[in-house]
């Protein structure tokens, strides 16, 4: 009976689906375990072999926990709204709702091409997902709850004193009773102080404008990353090296009215929460740096001949007497107000130039020095000296106050700036305020082992004491105070795109109003033109039916807007991260129509025990999810402070690209081993044209592209064309994509699963090599032969031998430890060792092979199910307890001794470990092989170390 993976896998995948084998229960008496993968964007031509790596690892772990008696929730869904899905639709000339549906469910695309679909691809790999809980962020029954969460954010404010969010109605009560002078809230910087009587005298519109300065999500004009190519605003984490991560389009800075999330309110809690979760230190450090906590002082500088003041946040108030100039961010509001007429043209030109650079690019580029003098001067708070005010793009508007007091002697960037513009526009000589420190070559940035000098009342003090005294003196004269600052900025939450969640917002007198939650969802309307525009007009502006009737409480025709009972709806949509910032909670109760999840389901599942996904989400999804979770916890809707207890970032599976080499200026291709210094142009070629020996299929290559039809070739001495190989990212554009469908069709899903786990440590990057698949496939066939021969089942009821039990229990111990430690690759190695040992022992004992099938089950579930059924069991192997390790079977009773003569090993002999040296010597001396080696001689000395060596000398 031969191993037939295709037949076996189809059978068991059907069984699992029909019997809902992996359905989790919300009211189980078993302990819970929630295992989650980051859900995919259904945005392209399906999965390649790199995509399932994390899914396979989580599936192995989920199946293992079921064997251990846990009620396991292991769901899957699709992050189907947002830029990735929309860009794919644009590139293929289709509508995003159509491509999203086909990419998930399969079907025929616009050009008549059959698309397998993510769901079918995932099913073929044999995952233990609870598909009854599937979510799609673009389904109205899902984004209804995303809209509901947005409304909760809008109707909340953050109290600094209590460190949590509260309902906005409580803030209104405070305003009515005592005004806002004593309110400790996270709010806009420019809030006006008012009394209770003044509040009561304000109109409703005035009150709403004030409340917008406190709400957790708010509308404000902000400096944003605008991408004309994508026609939308991007978050900082969506930009790489000054271009959009998606599509590589240039990004510029621009002021726009946008919805923003007040994530900055949670900065300290986000920071402290990292101490309570089991995440890699590298991810934690990324978030710490992104949050960017710094302790220092807020210093106020008056501007000479102006009523304006410049506020500066500094971590070094001890260096206040070393200030020689000030630098504002080019986007700073004061720039236009204080720039002199003489400098106006130069300043405006500089601002236009820097608008083309992203904040990340400006932060990273420490070598380029640029700036312009504004013509204005600030006044030193203590010495009253005039300090020239410059603008420079190394200062960011969103960090701190967007202004720095430049102390060249203590900061490298200030030092470089001062030297670069030395002697220009009042740029002063660098002042040295550090005793016994040479700054002739570089700034002195250390805070340690230095004494402050040339600094009036700070002279002779160290960093700590000088900082405290400087803050005290600044507070005394009313020009500063101690302050903790965070680099983390509020997150822009608007996108000028079509394919996203509509905001549940309409406008009255230009002010946002929330649609009552009972009327959700507000469904994304159909529009004839959904493409983004370079001028930023959102596609929903083209919608014929996109206005809100407050009497009928429904969406009506846009041309009915009268601003009396029918009002315009918000034209922007939410960003891609909206739906992914809470999705793990929806899986807990996916069919609840009234709330995103019931209190009972939330109380049972709590949060995710194991989360697996890419490290590229460190400062995006993983931060936004923590923010939303903490907010929902504050409002009583989430049971825990953190969403994900343990996080593992799987490494990337890299492709092995194939290269052909064309002689420069010709259409002749030379085999890699015949290049010999000739000028060649390397060209990537489809890896499917190349066999495991790196030999190119000439016919397929010539038929691939028209310009290759007439190609000529210089072969090696064996008449073959050998390609070059290089390990690179797996990508369609590199022609090195291998799909799981191909592997499953040829070798089976169990082979794919085992091979991906066998490639190397889960968290490391590793190259894909299809040639290695055959070895894993051979292992499964060898496993099968322990149970079957050509005539059928050969499992017997023989008592297992000591060696049988030893092989099994070594494997039980190793596999259980490896899965708990996520060392999946070494488990596969142990399986191979075990099967080899049992094969050489000619073991067919049921007592060994039944537990072996269970051990293999998390990794290769289809073959394990078939073996289990063939052994006579009627239930799924997934319901069976994991084998228990018994140490007694690993106790060594015998030792295979190497027997040496004059230090050279000649043979081995197996003896009981409890023998004395004298007993060992007696047995060895009587052995025929010893007699043959000695040839009648008597050894001068017999060296025996029990349990280690036997050596006969002389």
UniProtKB/Swiss-Prot annotation:
It catalyses: tRNA(Leu) + L-leucine + ATP = L-leucyl-tRNA(Leu) + AMP + diphosphate. InterPro entries: aa-tRNA-synth_I_CS, aa-tRNA-synth_Ia, Leu-tRNA-ligase, Leu_tRNA-synth_edit, M/V/L/I-tRNA-synth_anticd-bd, Rossmann-like_a/b/a_fold, tRNAsynth_Ia_anticodon-bd, Val/Leu/Ile-tRNA-synth_edit. ATP binds at residue 732. The keyword Flavoprotein does not apply. Belongs to the class-I aminoacyl-tRNA synthetase family. NCBIfam families: leuS_bact. This is Leucine--tRNA ligase.
């Amino acid at each position: 009976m031969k191993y037939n993976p295709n037949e076996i896998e189809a059978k068991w995948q059907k069984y699992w689906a029909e019997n809902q084998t992996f359905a989790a229960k919300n009211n189980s008496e078993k302990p819970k375990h929630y295992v989650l993968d980051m859900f995919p964007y259904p945005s392209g031509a399906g999965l390649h072999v790199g995509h399932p790596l994390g899914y396979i690892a989580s599936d192995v772990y989920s199946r293992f926990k079921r064997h251990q008696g846990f009620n396991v929730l292991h769901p899957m869904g699709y992050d189907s709204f947002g830029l990735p899905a929309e860009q794919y639709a644009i590139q293929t000339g289709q509508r995003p709702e159509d491509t999203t549906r086909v990419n998930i469910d399969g079907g025929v695309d616009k050009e008549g091409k059959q698309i397998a679909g993510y769901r079918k691809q995932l099913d073929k790999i044999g995952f233990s997902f609870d598909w009854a809980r599937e979510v799609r962020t673009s389904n109205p029954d899902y984004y209804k709850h995303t809209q509901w969460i947005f409304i909760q954010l809008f109707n909340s404010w953050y109290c600094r004193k209590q460190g949590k969010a509260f309902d906005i109605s409580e803030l209104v009560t405070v305003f009515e009773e005592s005004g806002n002078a004593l309110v400790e809230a996270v709010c806009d910087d420019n809030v006006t102080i008012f009394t209770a009587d003044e509040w009561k005298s304000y109109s409703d519109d005035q009150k709403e404008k004030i409340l917008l300065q406190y709400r957790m999500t708010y509308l404000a004009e902000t400096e944003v990353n605008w991408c004309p190519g994508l026609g939308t605003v991007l978050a900082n984490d969506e930009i790489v090296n000054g271009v959009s991560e998606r599509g590589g389009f240039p990004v510029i800075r621009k002021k726009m009215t946008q919805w923003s999330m007040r994530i900055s309110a949670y900065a300290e809690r986000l920071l402290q929460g990292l101490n309570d979760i089991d995440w890699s230190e590298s991810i934690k450090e990324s978030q710490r740096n992104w949050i960017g906590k710094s302790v220092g002082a807020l210093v106020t500088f008056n501007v000479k001949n102006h009523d304006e003041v410049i506020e500066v946040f500094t971590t070094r108030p001890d260096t206040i007497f070393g200030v020689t100039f000030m630098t504002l961010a080019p986007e700073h509001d004061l720039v236009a107000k204080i720039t002199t007429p003489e400098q106006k043209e130069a300043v405006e030109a500089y601002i236009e130039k820097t608008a083309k650079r992203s904040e990340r690019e400006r932060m990273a580029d420490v070598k380029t020095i640029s700036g312009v003098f504004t013509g204005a001067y600030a006044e030193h708070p203590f010495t009253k000296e005039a300090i020239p005010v410059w603008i420079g793009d190394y200062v960011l508007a969103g960090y701190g106050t967007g202004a720095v007091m430049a102390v060249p002697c203590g900061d490298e960037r200030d030092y470089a700036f001062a030297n670069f513009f030395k002697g220009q526009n009042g740029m002063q000589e660098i002042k040295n305020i550090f005793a016994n420190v040479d700054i002739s070559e570089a700034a002195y940035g250390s805070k340690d082992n230095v004494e402050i000098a040339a600094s009036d009342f700070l002279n002779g003090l160290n960093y700590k004491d000088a900082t405290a005294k400087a803050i005290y003196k600044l507070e005394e004269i009313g020009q500063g105070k101690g302050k903790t600052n965070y680099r983390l900025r509020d997150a822009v939450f608007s996108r000028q795109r079509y394919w996203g969640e509509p905001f549940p917002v309409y406008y009255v007198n230009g002010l946002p109003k929330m649609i009552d939650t009972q009327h959700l969802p507000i469904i994304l309307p159909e529009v004839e033109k959904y493409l983004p525009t370079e001028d930023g007009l959102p596609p929903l502006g083209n919608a014929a039916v996109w206005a809100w009737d407050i009497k009928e409480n429904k969406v009506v025709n846009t041309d009915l807007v009268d601003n009396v009972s029918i009002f315009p709806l918000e034209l922007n949509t939410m960003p891609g991260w909206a739906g992914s910032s809470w999705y793990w909670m929806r899986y807990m109760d996916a069919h609840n129509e009234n709330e995103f999840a019931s209190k009972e389901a939330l109380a049972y599942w709590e949060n995710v025990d194991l989360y697996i996904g890419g490290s590229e989400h460190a400062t995006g999804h993983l931060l936004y999810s923590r923010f939303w979770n903490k907010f929902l916890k504050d409002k009583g809707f989430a049971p825990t402070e953190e969403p994900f207890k343990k996080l593992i970032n799987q490494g990337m599976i890299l492709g092995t690209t194939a290269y052909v080499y064309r002689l420069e200026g010709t259409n002749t291709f030379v085999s890699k081993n015949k290049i010999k210094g000739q000028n060649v142009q390397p060209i990537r070629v489809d890896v499917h044209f190349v066999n495991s020996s790196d030999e190119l299929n000439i016919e397929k290559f010539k038929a691939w592209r028209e310009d290759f039809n007439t190609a000529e070739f210089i072969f090696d001495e064996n008449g073959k064309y050998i390609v070059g190989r290089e390990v690179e990212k797996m990508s369609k554009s590199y022609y090195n994509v291998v799909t799981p469908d191909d592997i499953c069709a040829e070798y089976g899903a169990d082979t794919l699963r085992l091979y991906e786990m066998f490639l190397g440590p889960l968290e490391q990057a590793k190259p894909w090599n299809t040639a290695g698949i055959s070895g894993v496939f051979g292992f499964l066939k060898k496993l099968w032969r322990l149970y079957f021969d050509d005539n059928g089942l050969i499992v017997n009821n023989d008592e297992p031998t000591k060696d049988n039990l030893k092989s099994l229990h070594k494997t039980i111990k190793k596999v259980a430890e490896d899965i708990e430690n996520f060392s999946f690759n070494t488990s596969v190695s142990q399986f191979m060792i075990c099967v080899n040992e049992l094969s050489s022992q000619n073991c067919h004992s049921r007592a060994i092979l039944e537990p072996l099938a269970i051990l293999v089950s998390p990794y290769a579930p289809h073959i394990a199910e078939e073996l289990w059924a063939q052994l006579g069991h009627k239930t799924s192997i997934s319901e069976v307890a994991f084998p228990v390790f018994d140490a007694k079977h690993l106790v060594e009773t015998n030792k295979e001794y190497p027997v040496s003569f004059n230090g050279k090993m000649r043979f081995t002999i197996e003896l009981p470990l409890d023998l004395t040296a004298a007993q060992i010597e007696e047995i060895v001396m009587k052995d025929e092989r010893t007699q043959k080696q000695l040839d009648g001689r008597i050894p001068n000395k017999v060296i025996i170390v029990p349990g280690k060596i036997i050596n006969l000398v002389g």
